[in-house]
Amino acid sequence: RLNQYFGLDWDAVPQHYDASLATDHGSGPSIAISCVDSARSRRDLHRNLFQRGSRATYWLDLGNTESGAQVVLGQPKPYPLPELQEWGRLPCVTELFPQLLEEQQEDDAPSCSVRISLQSQGLFVNDMAVRWASQLLYELFRGPIRQHGVLVNLSSKRSGPIDVNPAVWKRFGIRRRKPRGLQAE
């Protein structure tokens, strides 16, 4: 739908994202979209997307629990956005939620792609995450964004935005200084 609406010719490439793909300037992604089910996979993505030479400008990560989800659009490296000119870049999911990188987050629950996972995940939690992710991409393509993430709780029937706002990021524990080139002299 995004291709049709915006006249794009994107291809989805569902494959393991490793260091060679991250730096492949011929085919490396501009936007990496991840839906992983282990801390190890997310650590590998984090390492590959943050490495020098990575082509990915954005990282859209979707994660879920039994009745909740987080959808976060971040930037592994600085990229000029008018709304961020003083702060450099959008924090990624692994910066907002560093516990997602920790080994104890590993579990033996079935994969998101396995039918039996419905016993450990709500039936519609993945659908909700995908809908919010699609909305974030739609807004990004249309112009400046005011939110770069959403936290979803299906049990309470609530969703909350993650605003593009350094004060909000501080509540997540992010203390980022302005990039050197943007500091007042």
Residue positions per predicted region:
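Conserved SAM/SAH-binding loop
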Residues: 13-22
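Conserved beta-strand segments of alpha/beta enzyme cores
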Residues: 9-11, 58
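Glycine-rich phosphate/adenylate-binding loop
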Residues: 27-31, 35-185
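Short, flexible loop segments at the rims of nucleotide/cofactor-binding pockets, characterized by
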Residues: 11-13, 35
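Glycine-rich phosphate-binding loop and adjoining beta1-alpha1-beta2 segment
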Residues: 1-7
